Amino acid sequence: MKRRSFLKILGSTLGATLLAGPEQARAALFTSPVTTNRLRPPGAVPEEIFAGKCIRCGRCVEICPYHCITLLDIRHGVFAGTPLIAAEKIPCYLCMKCVDVCPTGSLIRVTQEETRMGVAIIDRFNCFTWVGMTLCRTCYDKCPFKDKAIVLEELKPIINESACTGCGLCTHACPVTVKEGKKAVNIEPLYATAKVKY
């Protein structure tokens, strides 16, 4: 990124947050970017300590062979420079290389099966199979843990939350785009909001 582009982004971001008022500006700087289909890499510690633990080295981004991990820019306040996966664009293929290179323990070493980035949630009002439009098994076929994390009951996909890794392969493959980039199956980052036990 060129200096001019950086300063433009910085200026527009600071200007927008200051115009919104001091309370909104403060909230924007500390609001987690982890939301529906926006996930931390595998093995990430809970969000409330992630920004303090991650040193923003970018090793996870460099090592990812699928280029699914990106670093957040300055518009994300205290989370700038931390890694994020946009599951509907490029999902996590669970190669686990990012976990191996993390020097701080922000990404804890877990197996593929133990990974919990989030949980897939099927929107039964928009899923082709659930509304009876056609027989679609795309999410089932793409799941690396089919018949464990996702099963077919009466040919309809059902998520087993205890086995779902939240990798986003189902979301990425889903042919239905609803609104604001959401699909008929989306990943909710439930584990990122877990409270740290001291």
Specify the residue positions occupied by each region the protein language model found.
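Non-ligating segments of multi-cofactor redox enzymes
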Residues: M1-Y198
